[in-house]
């Protein structure tokens, strides 16, 4: 299935995090944090400004990003893979 986000939306696949503590203890359940890093899979055409022009997004497909998982982030399962759909505003940084 192909999916194309609209406007300033971005589709991100969450990167797995190490589920061990610094002391080597395996963390489970609520002790294991969900990663706030991911890889951009698809981007919309851009944000529509008040004057009607489209401002392209700063992120692009393949970027590794750090994001804030907030109320606007939606989790979906596409082709058996869990992805996050979010606004570019929820992305805090691009990891280079």
From Swiss-Prot:
Subcellular location as annotated: Cytoplasm
Record keyword Disulfide bond present: no
Protein keywords: Chaperone, Cytoplasm
Biological processes per GO annotation: chaperone cofactor-dependent protein refolding
Function: Together with the chaperonin GroEL, plays an essential role in assisting protein folding. The GroEL-GroES system forms a nano-cage that allows encapsulation of the non-native substrate proteins and provides a physical environment optimized to promote and accelerate protein folding. GroES binds to the apical surface of the GroEL ring, thereby capping the opening of the GroEL channel.
Organism of origin: Aliivibrio fischeri (strain ATCC 700601 / ES114)
HAMAP family linked to this entry: CH10 (MF_00580)
The keyword Lyase belongs to this UniProt entry's keyword annotation: no
Chain's gene name: groES
Protein origin, superkingdom: Bacteria
Subunit structure: Heptamer of 7 subunits arranged in a ring. Interacts with the chaperonin GroEL.
Primary localization class, coarse: cytoplasm
Any single GO CC term annotated in Swiss-Prot or TrEMBL for this entry: cytoplasm
GO molecular function, one term: unfolded protein binding
InterPro entries, A to Z: Chaperonin_GroES (IPR020818), Chaperonin_GroES_sf (IPR037124), Chaprnonin_Cpn10_CS (IPR018369), GroES-like_sf (IPR011032)
Record protein name field: Co-chaperonin GroES
């Amino acid at each position: 299935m192909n999916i194309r986000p609209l406007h300033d939306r971005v589709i991100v696949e969450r990167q797995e995090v190490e589920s061990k503590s610094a002391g080597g203890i395996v963390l489970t359940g609520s002790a294991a944090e969900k990663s706030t890093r991911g890889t951009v899979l698809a981007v919309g055409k851009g944000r529509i400004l008040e004057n009607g022009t489209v401002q392209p997004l700063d992120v692009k497909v393949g970027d590794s990003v750090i994001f804030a998982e907030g109320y606007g982030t939606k989790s979906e399962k596409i082709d058996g893979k869990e992805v996050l759909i979010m606004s570019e505003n929820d992305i805090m940084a691009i990891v280079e």
